[in-house]
């Protein structure tokens, strides 16, 4: 049987065995609802709050209650964008984002437009960079939120979040960042980034699918999107997924403990992969290869070929890659990220994403 090689870690990483072990007691032996007052419920509450405190400390949060557990990156992005905009609608109805955001942010922004908000999508340059001056020019007196990703999920290009946040805060506008791809890969601490809200997801770092969190700085108003009980301090109704919270905290601890060594290893593998491909296939280009980017991500443009055909051929040969966000991979639309970078249509259509992870080896890259 042909060996299969997984090169789509930006879409999702396998559950780490150590994380599974941390979740096992909760899955099999802890029946309590964290909102119940009996002994089982109190025990569940202790475990939930320990996970919250641990994750908050890893993020550099001032208080553990700034961490809201959710079902993943999409819910975190929706809660941040819609929650802040609607909570601050009495102060204005203008939101700023970028043209290269994850579909979760773009869809939430589109929903705001239907509700009467104005949304400005900032442009990026040909390498995927965002100039803070663009943000400065876009801010208006009625701007109530800036939502800009930390690292692009397709190209890996990193935005200069501290500089962008400083521009927004000078105008007293809160900042949300989608750090789903960057958390655990590069340094991500809210005091250093200067953001007020931050989204992260467990299944990108070896945690369970369906786990995630939204950091919300104390004092930031947030209109809940799920209504019902008073869980998560009335910011997200519904019985907390204790196993997911425990797994997310465990995955985050492992990812941060191993981050520096793993980033150096993956960066070397990525550079080797790009060099080998360009040696073997003339004309292959790296999209967004100039600016600082995530160590595990490579977006490659192949001349004279359609990405869909290439992905099928690679899959048949045993290589799992993608054309972009897994949320959109079933669609045949060209990448909105590469189009926003102003790349020629034929280059956009011939581009694929290769993303490495904890189990990727030098042997696999050489294959």
Where are these regions (language model features)?
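Pyridoxal 5′-phosphate
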Residues: 1-367
């Amino acid at each position: 049987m042909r060996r299969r090689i997984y090169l789509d870690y930006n879409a999702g990483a396998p559950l780490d065995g150590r994380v599974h072990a941390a979740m096992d007691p909760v899955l099999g032996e802890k029946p309590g609802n964290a909102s119940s007052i009996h002994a089982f419920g109190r025990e569940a509450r202790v475990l939930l709050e320990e996970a919250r405190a641990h994750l908050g400390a890893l993020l550099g949060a001032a208080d553990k209650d700034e961490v809201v557990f959710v079902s993943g990156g999409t819910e975190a992005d929706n809660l941040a964008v819609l929650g802040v905009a609607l909570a601050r609608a009495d102060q204005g109805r203008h939101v700023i984002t970028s043209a290269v955001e994850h579909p979760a942010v773009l869809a939430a922004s589109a929903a705001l437009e239907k509700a009467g908000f104005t949304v400005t999508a900032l442009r990026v340059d040909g390498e995927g960079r965002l100039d803070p001056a663009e943000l400065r020019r876009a801010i208006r007196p009625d701007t109530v939120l800036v939502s800009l990703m930390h690292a692009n999920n397709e190209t890996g290009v990193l935005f200069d979040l501290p500089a962008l946040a400083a521009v927004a805060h000078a105008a007293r506008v809160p900042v949300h960042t989608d750090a789903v791809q960057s958390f655990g890969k590069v340094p991500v601490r809210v005091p250093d980034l200067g953001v007020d809200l931050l989204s992260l997801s467990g299944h990108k770092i070896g945690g369970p699918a369906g786990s995630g969190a939204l950091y919300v700085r104390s004092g930031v108003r947030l209109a809940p999107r799920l209504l019902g009980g008073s869980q998560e301090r009335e910011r997200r109704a519904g019985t907390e997924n204790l196993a997911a919270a425990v797994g997310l905290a465990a995955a985050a601890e492992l990812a941060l403990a191993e981050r520096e060594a793993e980033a150096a290893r993956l960066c070397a593998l990525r550079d080797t992969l790009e060099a080998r491909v360009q040696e073997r296939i003339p004309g292959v280009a790296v999209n967004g290869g100039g600016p600082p980017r995530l160590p595990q991500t490579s977006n490659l443009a192949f001349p004279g070929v359609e990405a869909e055909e290439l992905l099928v051929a690679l899959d048949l040969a045993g290589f799992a890659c993608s054309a972009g966000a897994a949320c959109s991979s079933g669609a045949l639309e060209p990448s909105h990220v590469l189009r926003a970078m102003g790349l020629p249509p034929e280059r956009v259509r011939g581009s694929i994403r290769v993303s490495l992870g904890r189990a990727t080896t030098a042997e696999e890259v050489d294959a």
